[in-house]
C-alpha cells in the first residue's frame, strides 16, 4: 500500500483482500489463484502515491523478487488522463513485468474487475478492442476474418468497437451502440469480457 509522506492512504487492507477475492472468483475455473505471500508492505512516498507512468523506476526500487508486486496508489496519471490500473505486457519491459499498479478509487467497488483485467494483461491478453483507445476504431472485422491479426488477436472474442459506459446499458449491461466495422456489419461485442472497457 502506497501512502503519502505522512502515512495517509484512502484504502484499507481489508478492501485489498476483498479485491483479490473478487479477482479469484474470475479465476475459479482456471486453476489459478491470487494469494498474499507475506505481510502487506507500506511505502510512504508522495511521488509514488500520485503515480505517473513515467515514474516506473520508483516501482522497481520497491519490488520484491519472484512475485507479482501489487501497488495500491491514490491515482495513476496516464497520458492526458488517469487509469484505474496499469501493468506491462510480457516482453515489453522485463524489468517491470512483475508489477500491477491499482488506483484506490477503482478498488472499493463490489463488482470491480480492474485487478483481474490487469492480470489479464500480465498473461499477455490485450483489450478486446485492440490497440486503439478511440471509440469505434478497432480494425477487427465482425465476421472474424482478420481475428488473428486485429482487435485482441483472439478469435473466440467477438470484434469490439471499444465498448464503455457510454454505449453499454447500466441496467442490463448490453451493448447499445450502433457502430459498424469496415464492411458495414454491426458490432455485437461481449460486454462480460474482463478485457473490455465495459
Where are these regions (language model features)?
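Extracytoplasmic/secreted envelope proteins and their assembly/folding machinery
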Residues: 17-20, 24, 99, 113-116, ...
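Intrinsically disordered, low-complexity boundary segments flanking structured domains
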Residues: 21-24, 53-60, 84-92, 168-185
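Generic detector of leucine side chains in alpha-helical contexts
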Residues: 17, 27, 32, 48, ...
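Glycine-rich, flexible loop segments associated with nucleotide phosphate handling
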Residues: 12-13, 61, 93-98, 148, ...
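Propeptide-to-catalytic entry region of secreted or membrane-anchored zinc metalloproteases
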Residues: 1-68, 72-77
Amino acid at each position: 500500500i502506497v501512502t503519502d509522506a505522512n502515512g495517509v492512504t484512502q484504502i484499507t487492507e481489508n478492501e485489498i483482500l476483498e479485491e483479490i477475492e473478487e479477482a479469484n472468483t474470475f479465476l475459479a475455473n482456471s486453476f489459478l489463484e491470487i494469494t498474499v505471500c507475506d505481510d502487506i508492505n507500506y511505502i510512504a512516498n508522495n511521488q509514488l502515491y500520485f503515480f505517473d507512468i513515467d515514474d516506473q523506476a520508483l516501482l522497481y526500487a520497491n519490488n520484491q523478487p519472484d512475485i507479482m508486486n501489487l501497488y495500491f496508489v491514490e491515482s495513476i496519471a496516464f497520458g492526458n488522463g488517469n487509469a484505474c490500473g496499469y501493468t506491462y505486457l510480457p516482453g515489453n519491459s522485463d524489468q517491470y513485468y512483475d508489477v500491477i499498479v491499482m488506483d484506490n478509487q477503482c478498488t472499493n467497488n463490489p463488482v470491480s474487475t480492474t485487478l483481474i483485467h490487469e492480470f489479464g494483461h500480465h498473461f499477455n491478453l490485450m483489450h478486446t478492442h485492440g490497440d486503439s483507445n478511440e471509440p469505434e476504431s478497432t480494425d477487427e472485422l465482425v465476421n472474424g476474418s482478420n481475428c488473428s491479426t486485429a482487435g485482441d488477436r483472439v478469435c473466440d472474442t467477438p470484434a469490439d468497437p471499444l465498448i464503455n459506459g457510454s454505449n453499454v446499458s447500466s441496467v442490463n449491461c448490453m451493448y447499445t451502440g450502433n457502430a459498424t466495422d469496415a464492411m458495414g456489419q454491426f458490432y455485437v461485442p461481449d460486454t462480460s469480457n474482463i478485457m473490455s472497457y465495459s
